[in-house]
């Protein structure tokens, strides 16, 4: 049974089990490191220091994504509220809930908002966000869920019209087959009056895309390298930062940014806790994350395969980013 705690206007359900989550992460780490392309699960990016670095990234001039998404939500928030008339706003992968506040504001102004349900893996961050939202929106009941958006969608409360928000182009961090499965799961749980709001980064000049992940201050590189530090600390690994060069490049075949590190020379890394020795060849990549970029027709095809239809599509003035409203 999930642990629950209740305070005025705030409820927090903890579905994540730390021991199970660790075991799953270790298994995924072994599987991905032994894949055709060596890869670290992106979870390793988000320890305490990594989360702080990511917050810094969102404020960088080169990293346009949150600004463009915010521009869209400010311009079209009233339309989103009018079209959905949502009683409940669900935020998947809530984190610090920045742009989500723009949707909350629009729904509050529209007079329909009753409940906010943020779901995120970080209990500490989620509790802080839940309290902040409860203070800022005293008439809204906050039901926070500590869990994984790929595993705990079934725990989302029903009742009334729901708007499920998946913002920040987080959907681009999923591989195509993962996206298809995830959208299919969402479609199966959506009622006729529910809607899905998704933020997607759009295909554009590769130079601009690569600049967004190769910032002049090197914060993104530091963020990615911190994943090695986290793995060394927790798994007793021997990743040597000096033996890897940072690389974030546009892959035009797959329409994604490929973000990670590349071995400077052949060497072996030992991961004691996993009982694993990894042999790297010279210039062999170690992927840490992908960030897929979309064209409207491509996104609509993927949605249709999951039995979802795009009802509305909004972009910023520069057509850098889009927010899509979908229904079953």
Describe each model-derived feature in a short phrase.
Residues 173-185:
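A short, conserved alpha-helix within the catalytic core of class I
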Residues 104-151:
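Class I SAM-dependent methyltransferase SAM/SAH-binding core
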């Amino acid at each position: 049974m999930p642990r629950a705690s209740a305070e005025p206007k705030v409820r927090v359900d903890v579905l994540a089990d730390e021991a199970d989550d660790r075991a799953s992460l270790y298994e995924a780490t072994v599987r991905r490191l032994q894949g055709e392309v060596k890869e670290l699960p992106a979870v390793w990016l988000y320890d305490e220091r990594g989360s702080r670095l990511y917050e810094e990234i969102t404020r960088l001039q080169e990293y346009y994504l949150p600004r463009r998404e915010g521009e869209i939500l400010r311009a079209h928030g009233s339309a989103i509220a009018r079209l959905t008339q949502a009683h409940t706003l669900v935020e998947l992968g809530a984190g610090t809930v920045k742009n989500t506040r723009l949707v909350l504001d629009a729904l509050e102004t529209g007079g329909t908002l009753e409940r906010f349900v943020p779901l995120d893996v970080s209990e500490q961050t989620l509790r802080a966000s839940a309290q902040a939202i409860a203070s800022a929106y005293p008439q809204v009941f906050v039901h926070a869920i500590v869990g994984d958006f790929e595993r705990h969608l079934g725990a989302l409360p029903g009742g009334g019209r729901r708007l499920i928000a998946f913002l920040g182009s987080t959907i681009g961090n999923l591989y195509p087959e993962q996206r298809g499965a995830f959208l299919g799961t969402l479609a199966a749980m959506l009622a006729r009056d529910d809607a899905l709001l998704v933020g997607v980064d759009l295909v554009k000049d590769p130079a601009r895309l690569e600049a967004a992940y190769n910032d002049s201050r090197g914060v993104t590189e530091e963020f990615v390298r911190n994943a090695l530090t986290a793995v060394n600390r927790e798994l007793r690994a021997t990743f040597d930062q000096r033996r890897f060069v940072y690389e974030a490049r546009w892959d035009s075949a797959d329409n994604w940014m490929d973000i990670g590190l590349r071995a400077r020379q052949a060497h072996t890394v030992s991961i004691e806790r996993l009982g694993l020795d990894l042999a790297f060849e010279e210039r062999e990549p170690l992927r840490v994350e992908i960030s897929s970029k979309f064209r409207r027709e491509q996104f609509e095809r993927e949605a249709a395969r999951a039995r979802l239809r795009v009802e509305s599509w909004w972009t910023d003035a520069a057509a850098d980013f889009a927010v899509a409203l979908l229904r079953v």
